[in-house]
Amino acid sequence: MTAHKLTPILNVSNLAESFRWFEKLGWEKGWDWGEPPTFGGVCSGHCEIFLCEGAQGGRGHGGVKGTFGPDGDETSDKGAWMSIWVDDVDAVHRRCVEQGLEVAWPPTDMPWGVREMHVRHPDGHVFRISRAIG
């Protein structure tokens, strides 16, 4: 098998609110489907994420402990985790703080050669915002 593209599908509790959350992160609403809409997609560059209200997968609870570090609990959140590779992790962090998004882990140079931060969607999905360093 040769894969040509991978598009994750996230279970969300409110499609309209999720579109607004992704817009704060700097993504754009690509499309929606249904009346009222219960399925849609957000886009950034060549990347797309599908959002499905109340179906297709599970979601976490949001507002839980940090994702890494001595007080972190990677298993406390049952939402999906995804890595998004960017040019400037610190610029994304500034945008998240300015927009009031929940930063679960601040920008940190990790021992595996990546600078990354974590931002949590209200439904508990965690996005690892990363770039290679070194």
How would you describe each model-predicted region?
Residues 1-9, 24-120, 130-134:
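Vicinal oxygen chelate
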Residues 11-13:
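Short, surface-exposed ligand-recognition loops at beta-strand->loop->(often short) alpha-helix junctions
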